[in-house]
Amino acid sequence: RAAKFGIPHVRVPHKDEDRMIELFKVWRVDLIVLAGYMRVIKNPAAFPCPIINVHPSLLPKYKGLNVVERAMEAGDKETGCTVHYVNEELDGGEIILQGKVPILPDDTIESLTKAIQRMEYGILPAAIEYVKNSRQSNHVDNAKYQLQESNS
């Protein structure tokens, strides 16, 4: 997709973090955004800039994989998504922004996943803007924001 939009790109095996770090330094990357990146960054502190991730649950609840299924199996009334900073702990970094999604009685894993993805599309740009503004002012107030999806 990057080529389609004229964005410089290169494929690097996910296990070669040293090469990724090197490229991000050369390209002077300001922010790394993980969306659908189902890998663990082993040493996030070695990267030259912040890394944020969008995760399909309301962290700190349901870290890791299969989180939509786990929320449904637990009988939760709502779930959602979280954008957070990546640190050494899996899905354990500081929360930037969360969006809540109700779990409806007739929801399936597929329908709930789609509802969460719609919320992710809404909060990820806002989270990126928040990180950008925080870095420009050299001040992070640790505010947690939440959005709510309607039942429509």
Model-derived features: where do they sit?
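One-carbon transfer enzymes
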Residues: 1-152
